[in-house]
Every structure is written in C-alpha cells, then in structure tokens.
C-alpha cells in the first residue's frame, strides 16, 4: 500500500473508532483480493472498502464496481471461515471515501 492509501485508511479507521466500531482486521488478504477494514458493531460484521483521492470525477467511492464487491465477498467468506469464534448476526459491505481535502463520506451498504 502506498503512503496516501495508508493515510486514507487511517482516517477511515479513526472515523469508525469514534463511532464505537471494533476494528477486527486491517488489510486482510486472500488470493482473491483484500478487505481494507473489517469491523464489528451491534453484532454486524462490516467489510469495508476505503477509497481515497481527488473528486475530479465524483466521489472516490464511485470507483467501487461489482467486480470489486464480488472480491470483497470472496475474501469475506474466507475471513469468516478462518475466524469461527467471531460472533455476529449479519454481514454488511460498506464503502467509505476520504478526499484529499479530508472530507469523509460513508456509504453503508445493504446487509447480506
């Protein structure tokens, strides 16, 4: 990960910690891809994609496409399989964007 990417992710982690999320993992990788942040709140497991950068062509979050979401689901399934003691009732894929100006937009997705 590049330095800017780490800065965006650190800001996203702070955002979630300030809202009482428990960060379970960061940059969890599997052969299908990576999940930037895995967090837990109110028995919901959040698989979070962080996007950062300029808003030249709209919010950076809009760069998340269906292919990326499928990768997150595959990696999420692997994470769950390798963490059987983790207790949760639902799974949700979320996207958070951090612009170069520090603006944070959080897009909680539908629960799976």
UniProtKB/Swiss-Prot annotation:
Gene Ontology MF: a single term: nucleic acid binding
Cysteine disulfide links: none
Coiled-coil region list: none
InterPro entries hit by this protein: Restrct_endonuc-II-like, tRNA_endonuc-like_dom_sf, UPF0102_YraN-like
SUPFAM superfamilies, alphabetized: Restriction endonuclease-like
Domain of life according to the entry: Bacteria
PANTHER family, A to Z: UPF0102 PROTEIN YRAN
Similarity comment: Belongs to the UPF0102 family.
Name of this chain's protein: UPF0102 protein Pmob_0702
Organism: Petrotoga mobilis (strain DSM 10674 / SJ95)
């Amino acid at each position: 990960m590049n330095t800017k990417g780490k800065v965006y992710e650190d800001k996203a982690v702070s955002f979630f910690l300030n809202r009482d999320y428990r960060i379970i993992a960061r940059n969890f990788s599997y052969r299908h891809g990576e999940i930037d942040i895995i967090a837990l709140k109110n028995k919901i497991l959040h698989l979070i994609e962080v996007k950062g950068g300029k808003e030249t062509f709209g919010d950076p979050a809009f760069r998340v496409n269906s292919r990326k979401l499928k990768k997150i689901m595959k990696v999420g399934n692997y994470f769950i399989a390798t963490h059987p003691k983790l207790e949760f009732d639902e799974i949700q894929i979320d996207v958070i964007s951090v612009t170069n100006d520090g603006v944070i937009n959080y897009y909680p997705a539908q629960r799976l």
